[in-house]
Amino acid sequence: MDTGFIDHGKIESYLANTLPPEKSEVREILQEARQLKGIGFDRAERLLMLEDPALLEEVFETANFIKNEIYGRRLVLFAPLYVSNLCMNDCLYCAFRKSNKEISRKTLTIEEIKRETEILVSQGHKRILLVSGEGLGLSAVDYSIKAIEAVYSVKVPPNGEIRRVNINIAALPVESYKRLKEARIGTYQLFQETYHLGTFKAMHPSGPKADYLYHLTAMDRAMEGGIEDVGVGILFGLYDYRFEVMALLQHIRHLEERFGVGPHTISLPRIEPATGSEIADNPPHRVSDLEFKKIIALLRITVPYTGMILSTREDAGMRRDSFSLGISQVSAGSRTNPGGYSQEDAGAQFSLGDHRTLDEVIHDIASMGYVPSFCTGCYRLGRVGRDFMDLAKPGLIKRFCLPNALTTFKEYLVHYSTPETREIGEKVIESMLQEVPDAQTRAKTEEYLQKIVDGGKDLYF
């Protein structure tokens, strides 16, 4: 069967016939990586074969250096908003699959979506990822657009609102992506789950998602439809992680060659237990913690300007470790079932590893010296897609990122945080303010911070 731009034979031959790199080669690659321009995908494939624990530590140190140089100590926060768990697919690893009788099914009404949004806004969230199963057929896009409009319409005094809605829904035709673009979505996100054709077909026995090529080319159609920011992802544990990473790099290369820019984000979930799924309970290719850290670090080194996302599938310890390796966005206070923020419900897509509230996550992040960020400035000023990368790669985007992180964090501290989080958060802001790169921007940031204390909101560069 045609596998599109994923060259299975090349990947399988490489994995079968290639030895791990020597110390000298690893260090040469890492030295190149420290130039902050990424490394060739052939070089990344060499690091992928690395198993020596001592050399892996050097890879981790390099990834940490790159993360700090490009992103500083910022972590973007968001929450998923699940609006429907109806699904026509029968993905073996997912609790939403149509044959699963062990969960209750629900599609939120527009009023219920607004209520869920009000709860998220009242916690302090500014960014959400709208998620839906593939169960609404021809009406899915109409429903999604109404859901997006509902989220944006919610205002909770004194300054509560969602400022960026990203969306994760099934693969669509070009015309539908054009409609989503008009609805003011941020990033369109869709996971390939596995790039390995045999595994993909085994894991997706029926439903629209069973079409490997249609699913694989979704990002092409999204970008043809005018969506500048797209997010890709792999569900690690379904097949050999080395194959998956090499295929992901081929996908990125394809997008760069065709559209001039790769994905805006890469999501890195590991398969976790899901109600009614034996596969989820016993992954066929379980990825160890060390292997997972290698994946994160390798991708940060290879595509240094691409956002990398870790969800609450992972426990607090792994999430902490991942920050220094390259993760730049994390979800917080998540629920993975429709209506989950307003009531507990047995309809979740998968089990969570991190059950903490948003404030508890923020307190933890701030105590580590990171700045929690709710920034949406680039999206609203049109710094997206290729324009974003044109600013990011020369290092110019940093002029905006830290000040915007500080102002959005200040909004959270003033209006939503506990006293304990506010105390540590103010210290982080005071410290990080000194790292704003130029005096003029620093002065303007201080002005914005004071305006927020005085009642201002949504101040960004």
What spans do the regions from the language model cover?
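Canonical Radical SAM [4Fe-4S] cluster-binding loop centered on the CxxxCxxC motif
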Residues: Y71-E112
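Conserved C-terminal portion of the radical SAM core fold
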Residues: S132, T187, L213-S277, H285-G317, ...
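Acidic, glycine/proline-rich low-complexity segments that act as flexible tails and inter-domain linkers
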Residues: K10-P20, V26-E58, I66
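Short, electropositive alpha-helical surface patch
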Residues: V141-Y152, K181-T187, Y241-F259, D289, ...
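Radical SAM enzyme core and accessory elements
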Residues: M1-E32, R320-L325, S334-F461
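Generic structural signal for well-ordered alpha-helices
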Residues: A79, T117, I145-Y152, Y177, ...
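Core AdoMet radical
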Residues: K98-R115, I119-M223, E228-V232, F236-L238, ...
